[in-house]
Amino acid sequence: MLYPLNLELCGRRCTVIGGGRVAERKIGALLAAGAVVTVIAPTLTAHLQQLAASKRIQWEAALYRPGMLVASSPVLVFCTADDAHANGLAVAEARAIGALVNAAAEPKQSDFQVPSRIHHGDFLLTVSTGGGSPAFSRLLREQLEEEYPESFGQFVERLVRIRQELRDRGGGSMLHQVIWRKVMDKRIIDLVRAGQLDLAEEEIRHGVIDAGAES
């Protein structure tokens, strides 16, 4: 069983083996997370060449060979090369240096899987089949994108402010948990989905006041 985890990668080193379309997708997500990315591949897609030229990624223009991961000491390694032998060698070296590895074509060789995801600001939903069927994960993600539009990310920003205001009033974490359980219900989700953020926030604020008075 895989352990679900949201990982802070800002400023952390990650290495991608291979320079094709799969690598391009992995690298795009890593850069968005603030990772420092090295790609090892004899050739790159046009987009990755642009990233290398602009110094957004470091490019080692060679087919992977043992010893190439030691210099960068990555925390994560993604093996996406077309050469299965090179991928296998990279998996072995990644484990030897203590890095976690994802082998795109061989889920059983992977230490972790990258789920399909919906990302609106701090609002993040992920779907995974453990590498069993990426296509099914994408299908589920597409359905969830319709059910959870950008308004959910916008509402999370409001909830952060309300939560901080509640903390500033004091009362302790246990009391706050009781209050949040009382004010959060399906109606809030329906309002946010409909884009009625002001009304949803108003209901939350009224609920917080009422729940606080009862506690």
Predicted regions and their residues:
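Hydrophobic, well-ordered beta-alpha structural blocks that scaffold small-molecule cofactor pockets
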Residues: M1-L51
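Residue-level detector of alpha-helix initiation sites
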Residues: R21-V22, A84-H85, G131
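Hydrophobic beta-strand scaffold residues
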Residues: V37, W59, L100-V101
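Short acidic/histidine-rich motifs immediately flanking catalytic phosphotransfer sites
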Residues: K55, A71-L76
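Conserved SAM/SAH-binding loop
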Residues: A62-P66
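ADP-ribose/adenylate-binding Rossmann-like module
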Residues: L76-D82, N87-V114
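An accessory alpha-helical subdomain
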Residues: G131-S215
